[in-house]
Amino acid sequence: MSLDNQTTREGDAGFTGMASRINPLQLKEGMVQLAVNMRLDRGVAQTRKGAKRLADAIAAGETELVLDFTLGTDIAVTSITRVGSTATVTTSSPHGEVVGQIANLRGATQAEYNGDFAVGTIISTTSFTITVSGTPTTPATGTIVLNGGPVVRSTYSGGVFAAGLYSSPRLDDSNEYIVLAGPDAAYLWRDGASLVTKSYPTSPVSEQILPGDDVSLIQAFDRLYLLRWRDEPEYRLSSITQTTGTATATTPTAHGYAAGQVVRIFGSDQAGYGADFLIASAPTTTTFTFAVPSGTVTPSTGVAFARRVCPPLVWDGGSGNFARVGLGTHPAGETFSRMPSASIVTYTNNQLLLARNRDEVLISDVLDAETYDPLLKSFRANAGSNDQIVALHPYAEGQVLVFCRKSIWLATAVMKPDGISIDPAASSLQLLTNEIGCCARRSIATAGVYVFFLSDSGIYRLDNQFDLKLRGNTKPLSDPIADLLSEINVTAVGLSNGIFFNNRYYLAVPTKLANGLPSDNPNTLFIYNMLNEAWESRDSHAFNLDQLVVSDYGTERRLYASSRNGKLYLLDQYDSGLDDQPSGSGTYTVAGQLVTRRYGFGSLTGKRMTRTIASVVLPAGATAAMDAITTDPDGDFEILSLTNNGISLEDYTVKGPIRRNANMLDLRWRTTSGRPILRAITAEATVDSLPKTGTRTEE
């Protein structure tokens, strides 16, 4: 009988998924510990394709610039008079301005006098001229102040704050466009078509998107709506009175409002005072006026509040630009509502549903996205709790999923035959679970019967056959990669976004940067492969993936990513394995990595690791390498590298010597150029033919 050491082999004939949290020694054949920038199609592992930069004509620009500064001192303005487009500003004390310097004026009743202006001429130490637009009343009225700066702008070189899709017979024969919302205009892009730019309103005040705004783009019928929500302080109103249709609201402290801005009044017992109103004037620092029906009861009763809001903007697909939706009391009556300011919205069953506040959902009239009935077509979810609505999402059979931060509800809102109100007998609001909720509304994606979403506890998946059992099945879909998700920046998790495409769920999340600091924007892409029923890869890019969109590219449906820096990228495009640089020129190599499961060769004892054999395919110019990672003793070293210097794709069976003693072995496959393919891998080790024995001498 031979006493030679036995050679044993262990390996993987293909690769199906990634499980980084599980003990790598327990992984089944085909599973890997880590896959970075890889695709696991048909059992082979290949580096992903490169991303192509698009839409360079978009002028949204880079992200905002943040500087330390100290504001100048406010100076009272005694008068502003106008002749033509030239206005003369007179101050109560020396202004200190020079020609060309930017002066900020605010507090004028006439909106045209408010804003940043370049000083035209210096008349005296207390007066200078500026150029204004329009024909505002002269002299100006209101409590006006001047601040010499430095200038604090809303945006510095802009950015892209949201992305969506739009198609209509009114635009390019119903071809689909990707819409990118910039700070002062929206851009519509389609492959092969000219860029379409649609500006936001500039009167009575300029409508802009500011950093920190929560922005949504949604199409309802043939109209495109841009909705914004901005954190603004609330004021408890001391009183509201009205005379001949002009309401005057009084605040206990200075409100800072100006004519032309929009304010939401809520809490009054009189429905006529409950809406988003256009501020007509601000006579003093503690009062402002707005229009209401002349028959509204005065004074207001109840506890009323006011807060500034950003009115929804709408574009009808024609040659014009965006406009504000209607404001104030609805023409149909005080109990109806126009479209309120909101950012949580969905479109289903020819109706627009939006969250007006933390627990209330309004439903629009059928085929009319700008008419709402808060009394007869609304519902509340988890009212009275410390929960809040995060997202609304269409579900099966006309139902709507209401995702709160700590719970999930299923709303069935059945309209009466007249289509005007909800039928209470046939409608319901059902709690699916109060154990998990959603922490990022853009992470929700539908895939057939499934709905994917990101929660504080991980990534989950619902379906219409399983939803009622969700309460007893709280294990997240992301459990195999929970350690990787632990790197998410929780302060920015709400910016995460997901989409389903090509049998995969893509989720972009903010994780650590290369320097170890947390990213404030989604920079890492996790991919779940539905065909393999496993996590496939963790992708990294040099640009942020602020919103994922699926649209046409030529004759195919493709996956895009819009970035906060004002760029649009087509993902998985270049076979070269090169990503376009965000800067506008040059490329960088997509570095792929795969770490196999841990090979123990059937025992926990020491072995002689001899070699590895791999079946690989290298395109022309591609380069790859293999590392061995040993356990007990620990080691990490390269065992082979390979470059295809030819002009065509080549198949290889490569062998890498290890020649180390260890208990266990991991193999790391690295790609450094091109898109190499790893088809199968085997490791060999020699094991003692006889078990280890010891001797003991007794006396």
For each predicted feature, which ranges?
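Predominantly extracellular/luminal cell-surface or secreted proteins
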Residues: 104-108, 131-133, 189-191, 264-268, ...
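Small/polar beta-strand repeat architecture
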Residues: 17, 71-154, 204-207, 231-311, ...
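Recurrent small/Gly-Pro-centered beta-turn motifs in extracellular repeat architectures
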Residues: 132, 182-183, 228, 292, ...
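Hydrophobic/aromatic beta-strand segments within beta-rich folds
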Residues: 89, 100-103, 128, 249, ...
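Generic recognition of long tandem-repeat/solenoid scaffolds
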Residues: 85-91, 130, 178, 226, ...
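Beta-propeller and closely related beta-pinwheel folds
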Residues: 155-161, 198-210, 326-495, 534, ...
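Short, surface-exposed terminal/edge motifs of secreted or surface/virion proteins that either
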Residues: 126-133, 185-199, 232-233, 286-294, ...
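Beta-sheet repeat architectures centered on beta-propellers
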Residues: 1-70, 150-200, 204, 208-225, ...
